[in-house]
Curated annotation (Swiss-Prot):
Organism of derivation: Saccharomyces cerevisiae (strain ATCC 204508 / S288c) (Baker's yeast)
Result, substituting residue 295 to A: Does not impair function
GO CC field: cytoplasm; cytosol; cytosolic [4Fe-4S] assembly scaffold complex; iron-sulfur cluster assembly complex; nucleus
Gene behind this protein: NBP35
GO BP term, example: iron-sulfur cluster assembly
Cofactor: [4Fe-4S] cluster
Residue positions binding ATP: 80-87
Effect of residue 27 to A: Supports growth, albeit at a lower rate
Name the UniProt record assigns to this protein: Cytosolic Fe-S cluster assembly factor NBP35
Recorded family membership: Belongs to the Mrp/NBP35 ATP-binding proteins family. NUBP1/NBP35 subfamily.
Signal peptide: none
The organism's place on the tree of life at top rank: Eukaryota
Function comment: Component of the cytosolic iron-sulfur (Fe/S) protein assembly (CIA) machinery. Required for maturation of extramitochondrial Fe-S proteins. The NBP35-CFD1 heterotetramer forms a Fe-S scaffold complex, mediating the de novo assembly of an Fe-S cluster and its transfer to target apoproteins. Required for biogenesis and export of both ribosomal subunits, which may reflect a role in assembly of the Fe/S clusters in RLI1, a protein which performs rRNA processing and ribosome export.
Residue positions binding [4Fe-4S] cluster 2: 253, 256
Length: 328
């Protein structure tokens, strides 16, 4: 028997704790053994709260590990800056993988304050149901399932205004309680930059194993500056970097097939950055205005425009990504 989950509210998702102010720089973390004790805690308005929180191993992590044990490959989609097409690429990656009928694919939207995967995957009006086996994800196709906070909002344009503790609790629920069953791939779309969501997902999934991160950028230096920070975060957090994809890399006219550079790579672009930092360059994807149209319609751009240079480029990136995780 299944039932529809109620909309997200304080009763359904109570905060584990509420801090008096956002965590300061060099904060050891409210749940760490050094919470309230480190040098960074001196004078912090949260000191007493952090000291009172329970310490020790998180009892939910074994449950998360068990729930995700049937998932073969787990991929984080990251970007240093917003607006580079990270969520768009996460959606196209999900469409591309699920085009193989032998693969079972899940898409988890962890951009909690700006969820967009449901719209791009064409299931914006769906709701989440709960059964004895947990939360049932929304199925886009027979072999593509998705989960997002968007399905739990009272209105499509309802704002999510949460601090880190409540975000962490929702991430735990998605990892621990969603009945993904057996998947070949779980694509995890994250917010831009490095935030609570990134730290939490790495902490909660460390034991279950993350194959690595796919980093999305655009060619211009202003985007690459933040990508360098994202890559540094991955290295410090012990997250394997599967590779980098340069999105919006030129514009190919659908009529004359001529190519123009809209966002010029003033410092060499993504490929040069990969050579500099010693990470894998998965490929470049050119601009195609029809990508945005397909996302707005909740349809697969790859199916709608298979002859587009952008479609070929995306499929090449997906092939390189599958090779990077050993799925050949």
């Amino acid at each position: 028997m299944t039932e529809i989950l109620p909309h997200v509210n304080d009763e359904v998702l109570p905060a584990e704790y509420e801090l008096n102010q956002p965590e300061p720089e060099h904060c050891p973390g409210p749940e760490s053994d050094m919470a309230g004790k480190s040098d960074a805690c001196g004078g912090c308005a949260n000191k007493e709260i952090c000291e009172s929180l329970p310490k020790g191993p998180d009892p939910d992590i074994p449950l998360i590990t068990d729930n995700l044990s049937g998932i073969e490959h787990k991929i984080l989609v990251l970007s240093g800056k917003g607006g580079v097409g990270k969520s768009t690429f996460a959606a196209m990656l999900s469409w591309a993988l699920s085009a193989d009928e032998d693969l079972q694919v899940g898409a988890m939207d962890l951009d909690i304050c700006g969820p967009s995967l449901p719209h791009m995957l064409g299931c914006i009006k769906e709701t989440v149901h709960e059964s004895n086996s947990g939360w049932t994800p929304v199925y886009v196709t027979d072999n593509l399932a998705t989960m997002s906070i968007q399905y739990m909002l009272p209105e499509d344009d309802s704002a999510i205004i949460w601090r880190g503790s409540k975000k962490n609790l929702l991430i735990k629920k998605f990892l621990k309680d969603v009945d993904w069953d057996k998947l070949d791939y779980l694509v995890i779309d994250t917010p831009p930059g490095t935030s609570d969501e990134h730290i939490s997902i790495n902490k909660y999934m460390r034991e279950s194993g993350i194959d690595g991160a796919l980093v999305v950028t655009t060619p211009q230096e202003v985007a690459l500056l933040d990508v360098r920070k994202e890559i540094d975060f991955c290295k410090k957090a012990g997250i394997n970097i599967l590779g980098l994809v340069e999105n919006m890399s030129g514009f190919v006219c659908p009529n004359c097939k001529g190519e123009s550079q809209i966002f010029k790579a003033t410092t060499g672009g993504g490929e040069a950055l990969c050579k500099e930092l010693g990470i894998k360059f998965l490929g470049s994807v050119p601009l195609d205005p029809r990508i945005g149209k397909s996302c707005d319609m909740g349809e697969s751009f790859l199916d709608n425009y298979p002859d587009s240079p952008a479609s070929s480029a995306v499929l090449n990136v997906v092939e390189a990504l599958r090779d990077a995780v050993g799925d050949v």
